[in-house]
Amino acid sequence: MQDFFGSVRRSLVFRPSSDDDNQENQPPFPGVLADKITSCIRKSKIFIKPSFSPPPPANTVDMAPPISWRKGQLIGRGAFGTVYMGMNLDSGELLAVKQVLIAANFASKEKTQAHIQELEEEVKLLKNLSHPNIVRYLGTVREDDTLNILLEFVPGGSISSLLEKFGPFPESVVRTYTRQLLLGLEYLHNHAIMHRDIKGANILVDNKGCIKLADFGASKQVAELATMTGAKSMKGTPYWMAPEVILQTGHSFSADIWSVGCTVIEMVTGKAPWSQQYKEVAAIFFIGTTKSHPPIPDTLSSDAKDFLLKCLQEVPNLRPTASELLKHPFVMGKHKESASTDLGSVLNNLSTPLPLQINNTKSTPDSTCDDVGDMCNFGSLNYSLVDPVKSIQNKNLWQQNDNGGDEDDMCLIDDENFLTFDGEMSSTLEKDCHLKKSCDDISDMSIALKSKFDESPGNGEKESTMSMECDQPSYSEDDDELTESKIKAFLDEKAADLKKLQTPLYEEFYNSLITFSPSCMESNLSNSKREDTARGFLKLPPKSRSPSRGPLGGSPSRATDATSCSKSPGSGGSRELNINNGGDEASQDGVSARVTDWRGLVVDTKQELSQCVALSEIEKKWKEELDQELERKRQEIMRQAGLGSSPRDRGMSRQREKSRFASPGK
């Protein structure tokens, strides 16, 4: 109240009016004073309710009409329900439909409605996201007992399914997948969204090696979940959970970074972290009490180990962000450049006599070729004097630029080779022809050396051993290449199977387009016209006449001959009649004109279907004629050979002979 009276007192400013100038000594009237107090209070806006800003306009996506879709075959099962293949009947786009039961698994109606509302709010949040490494959400459709979540369809399988089929991934594949995973996670974090359930089962891979983060079953906006101590809910899988998530002490984006490290260990070992030592409940207690990270495999490179140690920091604030991890040497592949530098220093020392270099090779028989592409074969010495570091800098393997790289580049992997580092390096080195002369000299030296070895009979066995060591790649290289080729073959096979599943949906979509086309609508206006069309095509007489009777009057054959079908026999009821009659001819011309105006996909589809039917009819007719011709040829050959009639006739005559001998009295 004191503030109220103080504001009123400060707002009261009495100014003399023109009448007051004439009557300076007269006090103001009580009514005038009350009016001034009222106006001052009104101007001070004390009793006015605060005006809230109008709510933001609804998103245009939400105002869009519901998607008309049709369910296909079952393609998987998720944490909340089953996943089916579907098709958008308006655009023909393939969908992945996740069906969540909303009636049978809940104790009360309130919990059911709360769960439905949570999922619908989640989809509304995620519909606005668009990134090459993120699964796109399209909307929700509620039914009586299910809630259908419409998602982008990704051909292929998840990382966990690939691990079950092929085993652990080589480090090159892990690097490629990790980079794309970080790109998608960086996009989510920039939009204030935590995934909170990153694992191999929630990462989808298409047949081109492009991965997409999926199953945002536990994601929320941080602004909606955060409290004074951070988010307080625990969702996810225990093996991939960060310690602060298990302890429920509040977590942020750094919990996703911990899950990224656990996913990398999963791809390297083929197993979930901690799964070999503890069950799920025991893993929760162990991670929550010790706060230690999963064991790191010893087979990894130093850069990969350093990457995992940074992701699996015990203190959440010490973990780097997704943007910082994208600049790590393991993700960028800088260890390849360092190895190439060592290779260049070795190749630049070829000024020493070549036999000494070969003696060094023979003295270390256990040395194997690194995956960078060491040039053990003499035939590859043509490129030995080119600087590998410069060539790799000119054409970076991972398509990384100074601005952080383009996210779309990671999806443009070669169709024929899953990872083509060696091919790119060789092609780049081959383009540098300014040192070709010196390279040819070294090649001549290698040929001379080979002839020298051929002259000495005692060195034949050593030469064959050395060539086997240099020509054949190491076991690790063969194993990695075999695994990569198996993964690509599996993804291609998966895409082919899914293409077979989508064929019935496409056929139904095209049939629906043909059904609602203008030409079919015109043909459905009159049933008599369809009957006349059928009689005209089959050359049948009218219903009122018998086929054996002649025409009673007029010439009905005139109308029959004038009838022509614009489609092949297999095109159904969409045929047009051109009967030589005045009124009918005018109406048919109008119909044909309107049909001619129809352009687009429907006409093309009808033409393709009619052509296919016509070709099938021609092929069937040719096959029948070919069978008849072959039968005639066979009979002629048998008659020329003296075999007489056909085998069927001989069988019948043989039966007659048996019956005659069986009954000699007849």
From Swiss-Prot:
Residue ranges of every copy of the Protein kinase domain listed in the record: 69-331
SUPFAM superfamilies registered for this protein in UniProt: Protein kinase-like (PK-like)
Gene3D superfamilies tied to this protein: Transferase(Phosphotransferase) domain 1
Record gene name: ANP1
Tissues in which the UniProt entry reports expression: Expressed in roots, inflorescence stems, flower buds and flowers. Low amount in rosette and cauline leaves.
Name recorded for this polypeptide: Mitogen-activated protein kinase kinase kinase ANP1
Gene Ontology process terms (BP): protein autophosphorylation; response to oxidative stress
Misc note: The protein kinase activity of isoform 1S is higher than that of isoform 1L.
Residues reported in the UniProt entry to bind ATP: I75, G76, R77, G78, A79, F80, G81, T82, V83, K98
Numbered residues of crosslink Glycyl lysine isopeptide (Lys-Gly) (interchain with G-Cter in ubiquitin): K109, K111
Reaction(s) this enzyme catalyzes, per UniProt: L-seryl-[protein] + ATP = O-phospho-L-seryl-[protein] + ADP + H(+); L-threonyl-[protein] + ATP = O-phospho-L-threonyl-[protein] + ADP + H(+)
GO molecular function, one term: MAP kinase kinase kinase activity
Task of the protein: May be involved in an oxidative stress-mediated signaling cascade that phosphorylates downstream MAP kinases MPK3 and MPK6. May suppress auxin signaling that promotes cell cycle. Functionally redundant to ANP2 and ANP3 in the positive regulation of cytokinesis.
EC number(s) on file: 2.7.11.25
Coiled coil start-end: 101-131, 620-643
